[in-house]
């Protein structure tokens, strides 16, 4: 017989209070809340299951699914914010705080509406008129007790408005992966000790209910979703309460800093306010589990100044006593509660006076943070500030060798005061330094903070607070906040912080269409235009990959797992920076490749010593350094440390050689002629500039302000510029036979000299050498003559310059920490320096024809071959290529700048993944020429003229072929007269359609007479011409908006009856037209034809400005609107042709071609007119040879009209 043992059920009387208290904490923090209630202008986070369990109104709302599941936002119109605050406090704490009789009435009315029975009965209760607030507590068994709270003073903030602690952002991210994840109550609360239960019991027996928190506790919560790092930096010298630091335990807390510290429970006899004992004590940042009362750990021992801790991030906690006997809860009436310390400003209670004193620091006024006087870095304690200032002071005055030492100048970030730049010391919390930094790291943590979200480490920018997953992404983003913008545009004066930004911007200059659709092979300028195209024409929704989610919170496989576009490589060659005479590094490599013996001496201008920084001479060389601590606005000669020692002899030798080569290359084109190069040696006198162990570079500009730039990998670069520069500082160091040209005069040099300097400063391959050798030979003599002419006047220029020179010094930081001596990349600091409103670097802007074509001859050959072709009217008139030849400058080679080769800042998108698809342009060119030849010979008698064409005869040269016909219309009357006189003996045949008299031999070239129908009906609004009145009437409906034809099925109206008939086929649902490529069916035949262009690639719509083909008419119209906008105000229009130039420089270059053509035509016309006058005077008009002479004269004139 089996005997069953007796068992009894064990019940936790405090479980419900514990769970309700934790839920209330989650509501205050906004954690795991799945619904947002909006009352007036305040947002309240709450749990839908708790609200449904407490209110019938919320139960019906949530069960009826009337709220959108994705947002779960509910708005209550008839309630007040302060009333709903009290209702939420009651729901989550079973406590109602009654402050005045009006509040009772409002709570009773709200309780009736929301279906809360306890609040409905509040109106029947009688409250005294005492000013002290009443706290009505309802226990678990339903017993209601009323007690008058006289211990706390009345909070004035309570009666002023609603509690804004409950206001959270609707789109605020939750810490859980799903907004509707269930609450795991066992993970966090099953380990609550008996001592905590006893404490909660004592708190319930106290006279004040802790859940009834006044508004003043808002300072402790302060949007607890913010990271620990930000809170630690924003509130120095404060102990963050456990409710504001983390509040997450077990699985809810993803941070490694969570600690479960159990405070000592020793009764104390001190007073409640013990601020004097704990006011200056540094407290660690820890977290602990939260129950009914707020509990904080014991503070760490006070650290003395002489004994710093081994790691600033180490926090020592008191060890939990394992042998301490557990306190079993007994009857509430039998146990004597221990001594509890209550806060006088809020409802918090603590076990010891130490914890209370640490908590009282939150209620004290904000103190000024401890800021380093050298780098403006903030610290939380004075001890840490003293240690940091000792290191910062030594590092700012001591030069550091370029090995494993970190950079003194990281990328600059604006400090708290906004007036200076921070130092490389870390701005992250001191507790994270041991984890995130290493001794040999080349990058410091001054630019980011680290925070943990859902267990994932994120790097946050200290300037804009943006978060990044990887540190390299943050480093790349840091250029945006830097004042050094190292990526200039190749076509305008804009400078960008990232190479990706520059690439996106330059697309609008070049007009390249690099994004190609893989379905129809149509190309687009930007990815967004491509995406809209695929959505409209291919029915592809790119949002499917991020919006389709499964019921359990996972993601579906994307519908389009492959990339739906092809990114074509860059076809347009980038323009060079004409401001540089050469690039220092590329020129040095180019000389080594060409094995040219460099000239031995170059004289650097000796600027006035009164305005120069202090120079220290070491081993006969000039050393110039600058301190990184000087702000940008401060000139470097005001207290600048200039002592720098040579630490690396091998590196110095390499840098001396690089400096020697750089100086030679920068002076090779602008000073010495190609035939006679200057040969001298680098002397030991102070004429060469170097920066200690690092090299200097001298870059001469073609702009108005030449500059001398000295850059270093460790220290700040110093840029000296002047309004004019002295080329000859010491005449004793230079022989009078050596011609030296002033850089201030180089800007006036001829284009040939500019071309030679550009070609000589770059290493060339075999193909480029073949192209440029004839050019250099042709320009040697002119450049030699020009340099020789400048040799005599150089002395006068020097004297004037030395009197008016003005030196300004800027401190420019390196482009990136990677631009060290080993990377062979010089900092591009000269690009960003500005003097006044005008930049130093002047870039030469090329013509608007930026597309590079292979096989194009060099510019000098084109100019030589253009003159005889223009002088020969026979070849010019008969050649149809003369009508469509491009007159703009073409670039014969590509130019790569240092910023283009920067490997540390690559674009995100793979710009160079695909090889260019070779397309045969020759066939398209032949078809275009043949088409123009046929259309250009027609007689445009009845066509409307271009408005500006009456004053400009060459308006139609670059227009659409219809414009060519209109252009020929100007010169047709003399041609008609010649034909009539030539065939005056033939009988005249009259055309019945156009009433024009034409001779039988009118088709002299074998072409018949073509009838052009007149259009007598003209629209008064847009001046369009029509053949009949009915067509004009139909056209007028476009202006009046009249739509007389209505669909009987859907009621849609149309202005043309044919459009209505096409529309009615849609309602029939018959799709008779099927695509032969993809078997797709269409209702209309024209829709099928448009669709088939996707497969055939036919581009039947051409721009009338630039002859670019388009697949659709709407795309062509949008493209033409851009031309119109540029013509109206954004571009620079030519007055002799419809050419639109993007810059004034390109317009001037384009107008020079018209000038040469006009002079040539004018000379030819004068000669022919003079010949004609002589013939008319010598012979009578009735002579038989007169017609032959006139025929010889008229033919060249007619051919000239088409040029």
From Swiss-Prot:
Give the highest taxon in the source lineage: Eukaryota
Q: Which sites are covalently linked via Glycyl lysine isopeptide (Lys-Gly) (interchain with G-Cter in SUMO2)?
A: 43, 145, 148, 151, 260, 549, 556, 750, 755, 796, 806, 813, 834, 842, 849, 915, 971, 976, 984, 988, 998, 1024, 1033, 1116, 1139, 1142, 1157, 1190
Q: Where is this region: Disordered?
A: 230-334, 581-644, 731-776, 857-882, 895-914, 1172-1203
Keyword field: Activator, Chromosome, DNA-binding, Isopeptide bond, Metal-binding, Nucleus, Phosphoprotein, Repeat, Repressor, Transcription, Transcription regulation, Ubl conjugation, Zinc, Zinc-finger
Disulphide linkage map: none
Q: Where are the zinc fingers (C2H2-type)?
A: 341-363, 370-394, 459-481, 487-509, 515-538, 1017-1039, 1045-1067, 1073-1095, 1101-1123, 1132-1154
Protein modification? Ubiquitinated by RBBP6; leading to its degradation by the proteasome.
A Gene Ontology CC term for this entry?
A: chromosome
- Tissues expressing the protein: Widely expressed throughout the adult brain where it is found mainly in neurons. Also expressed in the adrenal medulla. Not detected in non-neural tissues including heart, spleen, liver and muscle. In the embryo, expressed in the developing brain and spinal cord but not in the migratory neural crest. Also expressed in the limbs, transiently in somites, and in the embryonic liver. In the embryonic neural tube, expression is restricted to late postmitotic neurons.
Give the BTB domain ranges. 33-100
Biased composition, Polar residues: where in the chain? 269-280, 581-598, 607-628, 635-644, 731-741
What GO MF annotations does this protein's record show? DNA-binding transcription factor activity; DNA-binding transcription factor activity, RNA polymerase II-specific; methyl-CpG binding; protein homodimerization activity; RNA polymerase II cis-regulatory region sequence-specific DNA binding; zinc ion binding
Q: What CDD domains has UniProt attached to this entry?
A: BTB_POZ_ZBTB38_CIBZ
| Region described as Interaction with CBFA2T3 | 299-522
Q: Where is the composition biased (Basic and acidic residues)?
A: 313-322, 747-757, 866-877
The places in or outside the cell where this protein is found are: Nucleus; Chromosome
Residues with the modification Phosphoserine, per the entry, are 130
Please provide the Gene Ontology terms (biological process) for this protein: DNA damage response; negative regulation of DNA-templated transcription; positive regulation of transcription by RNA polymerase II; regulation of DNA replication; regulation of DNA-templated transcription
- Summarize the protein's role: Transcriptional regulator with bimodal DNA-binding specificity. Binds with a higher affinity to methylated CpG dinucleotides in the consensus sequence 5'-CGCG-3' but can also bind to E-box elements (5'-CACGTG-3'). Can also bind specifically to a single methyl-CpG pair. Represses transcription in a methyl-CpG-dependent manner. Plays an important role in regulating DNA-replication and common fragile sites (CFS) stability in a RBBP6- and MCM10-dependent manner; represses expression of MCM10 which plays an important role in DNA-replication. Acts as a transcriptional activator.
Domain topic, free-text comment: The BTB domain is not required for activation of transcription or self-association.
* Subunit composition and interactions: Interacts with CBFA2T3, ZBTB4 and RBBP6.
Protein name, per record: Zinc finger and BTB domain-containing protein 38
The species this protein belongs to is Rattus norvegicus (Rat)
Which gene underlies this protein? Zbtb38
């Amino acid at each position: 017989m089996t005997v069953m043992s007796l068992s009894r059920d064990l019940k936790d009387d405090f479980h419900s209070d514990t769970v309700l208290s934790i839920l209330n904490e989650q509501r205050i923090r906004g954690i795991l809340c799945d619904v947002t209630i909006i009352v007036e202008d305040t947002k309240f986070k709450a749990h839908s299951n708790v609200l449904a369990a407490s209110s019938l109104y919320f139960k019906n709302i949530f069960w009826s699914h009337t709220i959108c599941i994705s947002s779960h936002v509910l708005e209550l119109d008839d309630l007040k914010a302060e009333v709903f605050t009290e209702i939420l406090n009651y729901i989550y704490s079973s406590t109602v705080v009654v402050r005045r009789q009006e509040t009772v009435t409002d709570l009773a009315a709200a309780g009736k509406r929301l279906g809360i029975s306890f609040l409905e009965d509040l109106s029947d209760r009688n409250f005294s008129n005492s000013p002290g607030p009443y706290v009505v507590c309802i226990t678990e068994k339903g017993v209601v007790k009323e007690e008058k709270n006289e211990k706390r003073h009345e909070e004035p903030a309570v009666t002023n408005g609603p509690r804004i602690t409950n206001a959270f952002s609707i789109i605020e991210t939750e810490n859980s992966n799903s907004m509707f994840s269930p609450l795991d109550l066992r993970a966090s609360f099953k380990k609550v000790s008996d001592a905590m239960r006893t404490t909660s019991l004592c708190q319930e027996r106290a006279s004040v209910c802790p859940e009834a928190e006044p508004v003043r506790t808002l300072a402790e919560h302060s949007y607890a979703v913010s990271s620990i790092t930000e809170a630690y930096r924003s509130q120095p010298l404060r102990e963050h309460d456990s409710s504001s630091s983390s509040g997450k335990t077990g699985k809810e807390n993803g941070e490694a800093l969570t600690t479960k510290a159990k405070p000592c429970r020793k009764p104390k006899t001190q007073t409640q306010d013990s601020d004097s004992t704990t006011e200056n004590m540094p407290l660690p940042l820890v977290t602990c589990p939260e129950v009914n009362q707020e509990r904080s750990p014991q503070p760490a021992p006070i650290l003395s100044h002489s004994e710093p801790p081994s790691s600033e991030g180490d926090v020592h906690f008191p060890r939990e006593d394992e042998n301490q006997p557990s306190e079993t809860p007994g009857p509430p009436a039998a146990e004597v509660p221990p001594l509890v310390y209550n806060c006088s400003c809020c409802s918090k209670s603590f076990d010891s006076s130490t914890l209370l004193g640490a908590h009282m620091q939150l209620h004290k006024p904000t103190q000024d943070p401890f800021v380093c006087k050298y780098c403006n870095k903030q610290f939380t304690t004075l001890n840490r500030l003293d240690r940091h200032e000792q290191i910062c002071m030594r590092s700012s005055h001591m030069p550091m060798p370029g090995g494993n030492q970190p950079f003194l100048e990281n990328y600059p970030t604006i400090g708290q005061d906004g007036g200076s730049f921070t130092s490389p010391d870390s701005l992250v919390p001191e507790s994270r330094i041991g984890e995130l930094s290493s001794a040999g790291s080349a990058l410091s943590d001054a630019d980011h903070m680290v925070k943990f979200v859902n267990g994932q480490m994120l790097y946050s920018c200290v300037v804009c607070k943006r978060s990044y997953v990887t540190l390299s992404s943050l480093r790349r983003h840091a250029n945006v906040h830097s004042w050094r913008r190292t990526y200039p545009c190749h076509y305008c004066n804009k400078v960008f912080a990232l190479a990706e930004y520059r690439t996106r911007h330059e697309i609008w200059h070049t007009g390249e269409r690099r994004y190609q659709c893989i379905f129809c092979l149509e190309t687009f300028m930007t990815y967004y235009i491509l995406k809209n195209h695929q959505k409209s024409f291919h029915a592809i929704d790119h949002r499917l990959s991020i919006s389709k989610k499964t019921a359990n919170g996972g993601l579906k496989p994307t519908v389009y797992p492959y990339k739906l576009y092809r990114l074509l490589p860059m076809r347009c060659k980038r323009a060079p920076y004409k401001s540089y005479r050469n690039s220092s590094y590329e020129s040095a490599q180019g000389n080594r490749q060409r094995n040219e013996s460099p000239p031995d001496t170059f004289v650097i201008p000796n600027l006035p010593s009164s305005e120069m920084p202090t120079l220290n001479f070491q081993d006969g060389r000039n050393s110039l350094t600058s301190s990184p601590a000087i702000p940008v606005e401060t000139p470097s000669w005001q207290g600048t440390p200039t002592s720098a020692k040579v630490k690396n002899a091998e590196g110095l030798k390499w840098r001396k050689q690089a400096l020697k080569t750089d100086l030679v290359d920068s002076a090779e084109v602008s000073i010495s002629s190609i035939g006679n190069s200057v040969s001298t040696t680098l002397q030991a006198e102070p004429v060469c500039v170097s920066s200690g162990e690092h090299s200097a570079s001298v870059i001469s500009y073609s702009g108005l302000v030449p500059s001398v730039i000295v850059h270093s990998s460790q220290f700040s670069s110093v840029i000296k510029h002047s309004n004019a520069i002295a080329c000859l500082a010491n005449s004793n160091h230079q022989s009078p036979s050596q011609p030296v040209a002033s850089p201030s005069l180089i800007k006036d040099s001829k284009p040939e000299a500019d071309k030679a300097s550009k070609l000589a400063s770059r290493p060339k391959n075999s193909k480029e050498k073949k192209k440029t050798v004839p050019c250099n030979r042709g320009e040697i003599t002119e450049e030699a003559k020009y340099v020789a002419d400048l040799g005599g006047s150089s002395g006068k220029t020097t004297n004037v310059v030395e009197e008016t020179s003005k030196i300004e010094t800027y401190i420019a930081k390196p482009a990136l920490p990677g631009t060290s001596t080993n990377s062979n990349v010089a900092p591009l600091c000269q690009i960003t320096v500005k003097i006044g409103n005008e930049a130093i670097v002047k870039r030469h802007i090329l013509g608007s024809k930026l597309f590079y074509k292979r096989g194009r001859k060099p510019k000098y050959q084109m100019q030589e071959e253009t003159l005889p072709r223009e002088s020969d009217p026979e070849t010019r008139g008969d050649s149809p290529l003369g009508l469509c030849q491009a007159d703009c400058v073409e670039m014969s080679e590509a130019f790569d700048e240092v910023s283009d080769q920067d490997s540390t800042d690559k674009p995100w998108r793979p710009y160079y993944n695909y090889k260019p698809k070779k397309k045969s342009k020759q066939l398209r060119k032949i078809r275009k020429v043949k088409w123009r030849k046929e259309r250009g010979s027609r007689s445009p008698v009845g066509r409307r003229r271009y408005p500006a064409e009456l004053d400009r005869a060459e308006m139609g040269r670059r227009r659409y072929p219809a414009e060519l016909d209109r252009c020929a219309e100007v010169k047709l009357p003399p041609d008609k007269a010649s034909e009539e006189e030539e065939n005056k003996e033939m009988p005249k045949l009259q055309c019945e359609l156009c009433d024009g008299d034409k001779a039988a031999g009118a088709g002299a070239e074998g072409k018949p007479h073509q009838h052009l129908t007149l259009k007598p009906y003209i629209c008064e609004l847009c001046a369009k011409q029509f053949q009949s009145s009915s067509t004009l009437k139909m056209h007028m409906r476009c202006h009046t908006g009249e739509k007389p034809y209505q669909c009987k099925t859907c009621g849609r109206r149309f202005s043309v009856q044919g459009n209505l008939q096409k529309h009615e086929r849609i309602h029939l649902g018959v799709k008779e037209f099927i695509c032969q490529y993809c078997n797709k069916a269409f209702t209309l035949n024209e829709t099928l034809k448009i669709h088939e262009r996707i497969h055939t690639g036919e581009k039947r719509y051409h721009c009338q400005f630039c002859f670019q083909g388009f697949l659709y008419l709407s795309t062509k119209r949008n493209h033409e609107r851009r031309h119109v906008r540029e013509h109206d105000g954004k571009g620079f229009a030519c007055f002799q042709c419809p050419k639109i130039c993007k810059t004034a420089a390109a317009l001037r270059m384009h107008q020079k071609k018209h000038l040469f053509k006009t002079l040539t035509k004018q000379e030819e016309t004068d000669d022919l007119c003079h010949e004609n006058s002589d013939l008319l005077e010598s012979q009578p008009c009735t002579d038989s040879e007169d017609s032959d002479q006139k025929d010889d004269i008229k033919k060249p004139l007619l051919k000239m009209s088409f040029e």
